[in-house]
Amino acid sequence: MKSDKPFLERYFYDPTLLQKGLIFALYPFSLIYQGIATLKRKTAKKHDFKIPIISIGNLIAGGSGKTPFILEIAPRYQEVAVVSRGYQRDSKGLVVVSVKGNILVSQKTAGDEAYLLALNLKQASVIVSEKRELGVLKALELGAKIVFLDDGFRFNFNQFNLLLKPKVPPYYPFCLPSGLYRESIKSYEEAHLVVTEDKDYQRITSISRPTKRMLLVTAIANPSRLDAFLPKEVVKKLYFKDHAPFNLELLEKEFYQNNATSLLVTSKDLVKLQDCNLPLSVLNLKLEICPKVLEEIDHYILSYPYNTKERL
């Protein structure tokens, strides 16, 4: 836990001279990683599930807004399922998190992002599975006619690949471990649609229950990206590893040491604080997506013969 910018975020986005030396020393391993990742995707068995599958993905590791994007576009359709890996969940294998808004498992079983999707998508079913093809098959079994695949670019499915491109890219366009990319940046050319923040969509933020002295507590990737949306009432920032659980005793200690009047958390973090008795302020995030992006997704869905405008 640190209150300043985490080491890895500095390493990937604003490296020191020493870190730059380490980056180039590790570059041969990045080339190996890139080759394996590309070869694995290109040679994977092709799956065609005969329904529209929209993959919301990115090329960089960590957060880039995939969950907010799904939360914004999935409610536009009926008979929908969302399939995700369920990062940092306590469970293994395939788990049905919700069926048309009826939540069946706990946040720890689902993972924070999948649980957030289940809480907000009342018309959709949410499924987590390390093997995405099994998740899609379960979605079909539950009656889904449209599937949104969270972080699915690397899978060789017959799908519409939408890639989110960050407004502020990593410092070097290298693959892990010298950079933050999971595949070559040339892979953007293989997507059906690439969307960039402030060009194709805007982030709209608001704070529920704001107070005079808020202590920011978050466990998301690249947490300093929140800085642009934070009010002056934030007295301190506590950053935890992406998806990490919160120690409530530690939060309470920090809360009183900083004379805070509430904890400021994101919606993703909020689902892990159901047992927290401290006052909570919530940083809400919505996306305003360019109509042309939505039209392209509609066009893809309508290309399947049994989908009609009534389903949109």
UniProtKB/Swiss-Prot annotation:
Domain of life: Bacteria
Coiled-coil intervals: none
EC class name: transferase
GO cellular component, one term: plasma membrane
Function per UniProt: Transfers the gamma-phosphate of ATP to the 4'-position of a tetraacyldisaccharide 1-phosphate intermediate (termed DS-1-P) to form tetraacyldisaccharide 1,4'-bis-phosphate (lipid IVA).
Protein name: Tetraacyldisaccharide 4'-kinase
An MF annotation (GO) of this entry: ATP binding
Pathway: Glycolipid biosynthesis; lipid IV(A) biosynthesis; lipid IV(A) from (3R)-3-hydroxytetradecanoyl-[acyl-carrier-protein] and UDP-N-acetyl-alpha-D-glucosamine: step 6/6
Sequence positions that bind ATP: 60-67
Alphabetical UniProt keywords: ATP-binding, Kinase, Lipid A biosynthesis, Lipid biosynthesis, Lipid metabolism, Nucleotide-binding, Transferase
